[in-house]
Amino acid sequence: MLKIGSCTVLFNPDRDVISNVETYKDLVDVCVVVDNSEKKNEVSKYFEEESSYIYIDMHGNQGIAAALNAGIEYLHSKNMDMALTMDQDSLFPTSDYLAIYQID
C-alpha cells in the first residue's frame, strides 16, 4: 500500500481552512501544515495544538516554494511514497483521492 502524506501551506488563514484540510486529513498517512503567515492567528494555533497534524512554522512569509519544500522534506523523512500538495483554499473529494490507487 502506498504511503501518502499531504502538505498544506497556510498564509493568514481564516476558519474555513480547518474544514478544507479536514476533507483530506483522514485520507493520508501524515498531514503536514506549513504556516507561512506573518503572525499566528487562531487557525494557526488550532493546527499547532491538534495532534493529528504536523505543524511547521516558517516564522513569517518565506515564500510558497520554501514552505512546500519544508513540508515535503518532512514527508520525505517519514518515507512517504507520494506527496499531496494543497493550498489552504483547496478541498479534496474522496472520489478524487480513491482514483490515485487506480494508477498503474
Name each model feature, range by range.
Residues 21-57:
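Acidic donor-binding segment of Leloir-type glycosyltransferases
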